[in-house]
Amino acid sequence: MPASHEASNYDEVSMQQSMLFSDGLQDLKNLRAQLYSAAEYFELSYTTDDKKQIVVETLKDYAVKALVNTVDHLGSVTYKVNDFIDEKVDEVSETELRVSCIEQRLRMCQEYMDHEGRSQQSLVIDTPKFHKRYILPAGEIMTATNLEKLKYFGSSLEDADDWNQFRNAVRATIRETPPPPVRKSTSQSSSPRQPPQRSATFSFTSTIPKKEQDKRSVSPHRFPLLRSGSVATRKSASISRPTTPSKSRSITPIRYPSEPRRSASVRVAFEKDNQKETEQQQPSKSKRLLKALLSRRKTKKDDTLYTFLDEY
């Protein structure tokens, strides 16, 4: 109801304004005829009447009023025309604004529909899945270097054949590259291992003089293993001891509990060193045995012999 009432009021106002505008235009048209008739009347009265001064003054007053009315009519008509034009321009601009709002809403609806359609299509589309494969250049064989150069573009091998092929290739590379030797003891020396062919030279140490034996005992080739509290220091100490007979001395070295456990290769080298030491000590044993036999039948005239043996 209020919308229809406003519409009716708007129509009534517009009709009144249009009627006033038409009346103003009609008055302007009638004003021309009135001015012409008034001019003819004053012309006749000026020629026939004796009182010409009164006729002239009356003509002046009428002309001024007619001019004022004409200007008033022209101003009112101009105002009405401008008001009508402004009103129509406002209506046109308002209509354009409404049309632009409707177009914007349509664009937003279209974009939203396109977005929803793409999202639904992305959920429906089933993307193809390809198997991940290792591609080698022509003429190359899978080795350890080639395995490092391969680029893997997936997280898992889905095909069973590909997985078996890859596993066989890895096994082949593992068989080709032997594992490095594992050290059994961390306390083992970093010196080069004693070659086995030198063990044959120990059988001839009994015929070598004592000075040459002392010189060779310092050689690193003869005693390759050097450790804290090592065998080399104990062997040098045993060589520097005087050759006096002692029952408590034994050939086998004493093994201390704090000494780390040695590997099998170290034991073999140590046994060879013990064998060499026993061979070096054989002349001194025979010397001590001879001295012990002579000491039982010691006389004053044998003192020179004992001193000679001690010096020897």
UniProtKB/Swiss-Prot annotation:
Organism superkingdom: Eukaryota
Comp. bias intervals (Basic and acidic residues): 269-279
Keywords for the protein's UniProt record, in alphabetical order: Cytoplasm, Cytoskeleton
Residue ranges with Polar residues bias: 230-251
Gene Ontology cellular component annotations, sorted alphabetically: cytoplasm; cytoskeleton
Residue span of region Disordered: 173-287
Biased composition (Low complexity): 183-199
InterPro entries linked: ABI
Localization annotation: Cytoplasm, Cytoskeleton
Subunit organization: Binds SCAR.
Family, similarity comment: Belongs to the ABI family.
Described function: Involved in regulation of actin and microtubule organization. Part of a WAVE complex that activates the Arp2/3 complex.
Descriptive protein name: Protein ABIL2
Originating organism: Arabidopsis thaliana
